Amino acid sequence: VTRAFDCDVLVVGLGPVGAALSALLARQGVSTIALEKDLDIYPLPRAVHFDHEIMRLLQKLGLADSMLAVSRVARAYEFRSADGQILMRYEQAGQSSPSGWPASNMFHQPTLENQLRGVLAGSPLADVRLGVTVTALAQDDAGVTATVSSANGDQTLRARWLVGCDGGRSTVRTACGIELSDYGFDEPWLVIDAMVHDASRLPVDNLQICDPARPTTCVLSGEGRHRWEFMMLPGETPDQVLADDFIQGLLAPWNVAGAVSLERKAVYRFHGLVAQSWRQGRILLAGDAAHQTPPFAGQGLCSGMRDADNLAWKLAAVIRGSADPALLDSYQTEREPQVRAAIELAIAMGRVVCITDRQAAAQRDQAMAAQQAAGIRPPPPAPLSIGPGCRLEGSAGAGELFPQPWSDDRKLDAILGDGPWLISKANLDSPALKPFAGDLAGWLQARSAEAVLVRPDRYVFGTGTPDALSTGWQAWTGSPSPVLEPVPSR
């Protein structure tokens, strides 16, 4: 007797990535059971930065305004020498982003997790189970069976698909025997989170202090918090640097005694790792289970959330029966180049910051200060395109992030709904598109395109004639073309 399915997708791990994936799947009508070994949300700050693209994803889940209210928009990111000279200043405030949201947002991770779980609590399709550990996995042609253990004993759960969102030490990845490829960047740092009592005594910008005696990061966190990260030096042990008097010594030059109180201290090894395979049959990996990055570019959490957005609509298309499961192979081919670019940027920044040789540091300072003096500013990072996969190869704009124009307080995504969308020059004066017609016409014109098909994760499938786009989309997803006339979302 074949066992009935308990749900469509088992999500293992309910950090931000698992919670976002479950919420996105529920929106697509896919049932999930999310398993989390901890009974409570991890109460202390971890990730502190997300970008405009993640705010746009949160907008889809109805959380953008509530997260914006408790986040702080980063004004600038400065690299300074040991004596305080500005080596590079990257202005972030007032930067227009393709999504219309602030380019750089500093936040408190437990707050985000609470808000995401609130979305799940309101969805009949999402079943959250806390205090549950996965002890064994088995898969066959039809589904995955997980043996799980909790205070109520052991049981088995059966699902069509399983996604491991269970972090850097992923049980799911280990159970599948998937190896990691390592960038060979491995630096231990002390991370300190503080509650702020007097904000007037703290820096207003995010700082990298390129001090060869001890490279240091000092950044905003969510409302009422600040973070310092100190590189550990050869010979130092975690016990030594975690001692309160040692930490007070590190903070002394910042002159914040009385202005902050310690909330959390932890030693982390910053490294760059990518799982060699993100899919094994009916089991997939997302977030830190699939890749880990040093924090210097603020892209760790962002990368995991992009995974969730890429995977959710594809799983939904396969589960609804229209798409061939091979569509899921495009998940890694599209996301891995994006992830590797983010990791390589973070490591390059880390190598600039982590110089401890005084002579090499002096040369770096001189070179960076000369560029700063000459007015040479780093270009804003271009939104990363997805790699080859579910896109109309060779068409202009394929794989780019499609922008979200705003018209007064109306936003394109909110008007058009979850997608996919087919937007053509011919329908720009429709009531739904008219407020955004100028921006959309400009986008199409820049790519000499008659029409564009935008996927549910807001990446461009391709440009061309509406017929060619419909045919191409159907070949990939099995679903009929999206309606030409976008329907306003209710």
Residue ranges of each PLM-predicted region?
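Core beta-strand elements of the Rossmann-like FAD/NAD(P) dinucleotide-binding domain
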Residues: 5-7, 152-161
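Helical substrate-recognition/capping region of FAD-dependent monooxygenase/halogenase enzymes
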Residues: 1-8, 12, 27-28, 37, ...
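Glycine-rich FAD pyrophosphate-binding loop
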Residues: 26-46
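A conserved short coil-to-beta-strand element within the FAD-binding core of flavoproteins
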Residues: 130-144
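FAD/FMN-dependent oxidoreductases across multiple families
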Residues: 240-303, 323, 345, 382
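Conserved FAD-binding catalytic core of PHBH/FMO-like flavoproteins
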Residues: 118, 161, 165-270
